[in-house]
Regions:
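Bacterial Sec-dependent N-terminal signal peptides
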Residues: 1-27, 255
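Short loop/turn motifs that connect adjacent beta-strands in outer-membrane beta-barrel proteins
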Residues: 24-25, 59-70, 104-116, 158-164, ...
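Transmembrane beta-strands of outer-membrane beta-barrel pores
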Residues: 32-38, 75-81, 122-130, 168-174, ...
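Outer-membrane beta-barrel transmembrane domain signature
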Residues: 136-221
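Residues that define the transmembrane beta-barrel architecture of outer-membrane proteins
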Residues: 46-53, 88-96, 114, 139-149, ...
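Residues on the lipid-exposed face of transmembrane beta-strands in outer-membrane beta-barrel proteins
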Residues: 50-62, 96-106, 120, 147-155, ...
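Extracellular loop and loop/strand-boundary signature of outer-membrane beta-barrel proteins
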Residues: 37-46, 80-89, 134-140, 197-201, ...
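Short glycine/proline- and aromatic-enriched beta-strand/turn motifs that initiate or cap beta-hairpins
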Residues: 23-80
Length: 255
């Protein structure tokens, strides 16, 4: 009798665990593209060149509620030069985003399953830009913390194993580190001259958008992902302008 009771309890526990289980989707991608870079703290010129990035995109979804926990990690390097080709700018950035998305649509379109989730995320960015021409103030630090609305959708093409995915996010409010116009890093860190260097931001001062359109397809018993990433980072604070507008082709695998 005790053994039967223990078995029943084990079955109930396993059943409860199954109800709370999460479906996970992990994608690892590499991107290559072209970027347009401007940072008026370093130079009034636009710089154009190659952008390379690594992207880790993870979604864990509760089976019972379909609530999604989303993580995005991205490392990026770029090498750019102006039209005059006198000098270069080298940049490196790391991004991390963690968010929660709730289901807002689950329907069938043309016999294919279509789902949409929406929510918000906490985003962190850390990086640098280095200008090879500048003797004074040759580098610029990039540090930002944002709250961003996020939306994603997926469509399963009927009678195939193809899945189209789309995701977009844009920072709504946040904090941004920036020197003021004409202020050196020596003044900030050695002399301690604070001059509005931690700047509250809104969508008006940092009109930024990152979106990703991909296609998942099976090949050799694996699932691959190809697509396009548009990443448009912009800011106008402390009488300084910055933008990094990048178009990338991405390719990777889904697990």
């Amino acid at each position: 009798m005790k053994r039967a009771t223990h078995r029943l309890m084990a079955i109930l526990v396993l059943g409860l665990f199954a109800l709370q289980a999460s479906a996970q989707n992990k994608a690892y991608m590499f991107g290559i593209g072209n970027t347009n870079l401007l940072d008026t703290y370093l130079s009034p010129q636009n710089y154009h060149g190659l952008d390379l990035r690594y992207i880790s995109h993870r979604i864990s979804e509760k089976d019972s509620t379909h609530l999604q926990h989303r993580q995005l990690f991205m490392g990026e390097v770029s090498l750019t030069k102006p039209r005059s080709e006198d000098g270069k700018e080298i940049s490196g950035m790391v991004y991390y985003s963690y968010g929660w998305l709730w289901p807002i649509m689950n329907t069938t379109i043309a016999n294919g399953k279509f789902r949409m989730h929406a929510g918000g995320a906490i985003d962190f960015m850390l990086g640098f830009i280095y200008n090879t021409r500048n003797g004074n103030n040759p580098a610029q630090a990039k540090i930002a913390l944002n709250l961003s609305p996020v939306i994603n959708a997926d469509y399963h093409i009927p009678n195939t194993k193809l899945v189209v995915n789309y995701e977009a996010s844009a920072p709504l409010v946040g904090l941004l580190f920036s020197p003021n116009y004409g202020q050196s890093y020596y003044e900030i860190f050695s002399r301690g001259d604070y001059d509005h260097n931690i700047v509250p931001t809104t969508i008006g001062t940092t009109p930024t958008l990152r979106h990703l359109l991909t296609l998942d397809f099976p090949l050799l018993k694996k699932t691959f992902r190809i697509g396009y990433m548009g990443d448009y980072q912009q800011a106008k604070v402390n009488n300084l302008k910055y933008h990094a507008r990048t178009h990338s082709f991405v390719i990777g695998m889904v697990f």
